[in-house]
From Swiss-Prot:
Identification of the protein by name: Probable dual-specificity RNA methyltransferase RlmN
Function, in words: Specifically methylates position 2 of adenine 2503 in 23S rRNA and position 2 of adenine 37 in tRNAs.
Catalytic reaction(s) noted: adenosine(2503) in 23S rRNA + 2 reduced [2Fe-2S]-[ferredoxin] + 2 S-adenosyl-L-methionine = 2-methyladenosine(2503) in 23S rRNA + 5'-deoxyadenosine + L-methionine + 2 oxidized [2Fe-2S]-[ferredoxin] + S-adenosyl-L-homocysteine; adenosine(37) in tRNA + 2 reduced [2Fe-2S]-[ferredoxin] + 2 S-adenosyl-L-methionine = 2-methyladenosine(37) in tRNA + 5'-deoxyadenosine + L-methionine + 2 oxidized [2Fe-2S]-[ferredoxin] + S-adenosyl-L-homocysteine
Anything else known: Reaction proceeds by a ping-pong mechanism involving intermediate methylation of a conserved cysteine residue.
Matches recorded under CDD domains: Radical_SAM
Recorded name of the encoding gene: rlmN
Note describing how the cofactor binds: Binds 1 [4Fe-4S] cluster. The cluster is coordinated with 3 cysteines and an exchangeable S-adenosyl-L-methionine.
GO CC annotations, alphabetized: cytoplasm
Keywords from the UniProt entry: 4Fe-4S, Cytoplasm, Disulfide bond, Iron, Iron-sulfur, Metal-binding, Methyltransferase, rRNA processing, S-adenosyl-L-methionine, Transferase, tRNA processing
Origin species: Trichormus variabilis (strain ATCC 29413 / PCC 7937) (Anabaena variabilis)
NCBIfam families: rRNA_mod_RlmN
Gene Ontology molecular function, alphabetical: 4 iron, 4 sulfur cluster binding; metal ion binding; rRNA (adenine(2503)-C2-)-methyltransferase activity; rRNA binding; tRNA (adenine(37)-C2)-methyltransferase activity; tRNA binding
């Protein structure tokens, strides 16, 4: 998995401008870049440390560099956002609205649990998938996020909490597999530059044809989470419009191939909607799809939003669905979302400034 080069290495007597902000670049890329500016190679490692571990937001603030060189590269962007809005839920979950260099707003969430700190990152401004139950898709889609804009979300939460981020889930605004190049580059950087283990990184997708198979070719150790949300094609099309062009059987075939190639278990996300997909017969139908390969089901009781009429099932209905899957020997757990008061829970990531 390789990141986009920081700069075209063309000879120049003037400090060269990287084609992308420096955040997201590897130590090798940064070393090549500083050498092109006439600096010794060891400056690349220093620059890497200041960007990823000291939180520098401008090259002019790196005190180990000469004032002359800092002035020469003052306009080279590192690629950090600014916090536009911050809201805190009673459970400690923090939702951030981050303003990017072009003025767009994206959302990220910091989720503290015991000794862990998990960050839920966005991969697009808005989302084109328009899932019927999700708040994010109601605001439309604008563009993909660049690699630095994804990595920045993690550093922002880490700095705000003053605690090392232990886990990152790509479950915020957007469909990651519609932004594969930047997502893969961000995964590389989070692993190798920020220092988060691959198995502590989770990539979520509703399923884009052929993209899961392509992801398998990278032999990553990240966790793949597939948003299934229905046990059959007709119901899935009702909830996820993009499913009309990608049959559930084809999606599951790609998932089986992914497990065979990577040896990694897949997580299936299943939002429980009262009276829609939460009946025992739905659970039984779901179980038949999941036999014969490594997987785990996360049941997610729905978080109601004002724009749609879906409701959260009762506790008894949730337990009944869970019991059927357990009786069918399917690995399953219930995941209750955090941060409800901050509008930060799964499916509620929405840019307030667009309302």
């Amino acid at each position: 998995m390789s990141a986009t080069p920081v700069t075209q290495l063309t000879p120049s007597s003037q400090p060269q401008q990287p084609c992308l902000p420096l955040l997201g670049a590897s130590v090798t890329e940064l070393t090549s870049w500083v050498q092109q500016q006439g600096q010794p190679a060891y400056r690349g490692k220093q620059l890497h440390d200041w960007i990823y571990h000291k939180g520098v937001r401008s090259l002019t603030d790196i005190s180990v560099f000469s004032k002359q060189w800092r002035a020469a590269v003052a306009d080279v962007p590192i690629g950090r956002s600014t916090i536009h809005h911050r809201s805190v839920a009673s459970d400690g979950t923090v939702k951030y609205l981050l303003q990017l260099s072009d003025g767009e707003i994206v959302e990220t969430v910091g989720i503290p649990t015991d000794k862990r700190l998990t960050v839920c990152v966005s991969t697009q401004v808005g989302c084109p998938m328009a899932c019927d139950f999700c708040a994010t898709g109601k605001g439309g889609y604008k563009r993909n996020l660049e690699r630095h804009e994804i990595v920045d979300q993690v550093l922002t939460v880490q700095e705000d909490f003053q605690q090392r981020v232990s886990h990152v889930v790509f479950m915020g605004m957007g469909e990651p597999l519609l932004n594969t190049e930047n997502v893969l580059a961000a995964l590389r950087s989070l692993n190798q530059d920020v220092g988060i283990g691959q198995r502590s990184l989770t990539l979520s997708t509703v399923g884009i044809r052929d993209r899961i198979s392509q992801l398998a070719e990278h032999h990553l150790q990240v966790t793949l989470a597939v948003s299934l949300h229905a046990p059959n094609q007709a119901l899935r099309e009702q909830l996820i419009p993009s499913a009309r062009s990608y049959h559930i059987e084809d999606l599951l075939a790609e998932c089986r191939e992914y497990v065979a190639i990577t040896g990694r278990r897949i997580s299936f996300e299943y939002i429980l909607l009262a009276g829609v997909n939460d009946l025992p017969e739905h659970a039984l139908e779901l179980s038949k799809h999941l036999r014969g390969f490594q997987n785990h089901v996360n049941l997610i009781p729905y978080n109601p939003i004002s724009e749609v009429d879906y409701k959260r099932p009762s506790g008894d209905r949730i337990q009944a669905f869970l019991t059927v899957l357990q009786q069918q020997h399917i690995a399953v757990s219930v995941r209750y979302s955090r941060g409800l008061e901050a509008d930060a829970a799964c499916g509620q990531l929405r840019t307030k400034t667009s309302r």
